[in-house]
Amino acid sequence: MAGPRVSKAEVFQGDILYIRVAQVGEGLSEAIARTWSNPGSANGVNGLILDLRYAGGDDYAAAAAAADLFVKKEQPLLDCGNGIVRAQTKSNAICVPVAVLVNRQTTEAAEAMAAVLRKTGTALLLGGKTAGQAQVTQEFPLKNGVRLRIATAMIQLGDGSALTTEGLTPDIVVAVNPAEEQKYFADAFQTLAKTNLPVGTGIAGATPATRRPRLNEAELMRERHEGLSEASLNAPRESEPEQPIVRDPVLARALDLLRGLALVRPMIRS
């Protein structure tokens, strides 16, 4: 029996929906659609993170179906060797900025899904290079009981370009030690010990009541746009509850990116 297609869903910073895909297979598009339409998810969401790190699967039709959720207009998506799968024109496509997280353990159909989302202009890829295993395969049983798996066809995107064994290079590369990435994947908020700072110096010596939190690019843009003074920027924020900090470098970068896009879009429209 197949496991859950979506293993985790969470809202970060109040309006960024995070969906972790466990495996690309039959039912994934429905699982993503349910998560998106859940009360408290789609309402007021300004960005979406699809985490395809450590995701695999060999159902390329399911990859195309999941990507189709984000495409408004009819266009070719993927050719898995059985003809081109096309997106259908729809009025209910998920139309928010999307960041797709990938790494070396993003394999097969998960790679194809990421590639389609990027090719259609739907998403940006962040993280590390993917496995380069997106291909149609066939298994042959051997006399000794071993099953030999052989690639029989290449996976092609809608424009005819093939997914190669080189893998996908993200639009924004975020280098993370593989062992550390697994730990962050299990708990994005944990702090991994790297250096021993003397007490009273640097971050270790900061006082939580008066320390100004580190600003990301999006917050800096907001403060500049709103014309906040330097004094107000540096003023203590004693009344604000301290929020947990996302330590996962890839996830944190995606949150910064989507927060920035959410701030820029209204400025462009105005």
Where are these regions (language model features)?
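C-terminal "post-core" interaction segments
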Residues: 1-270
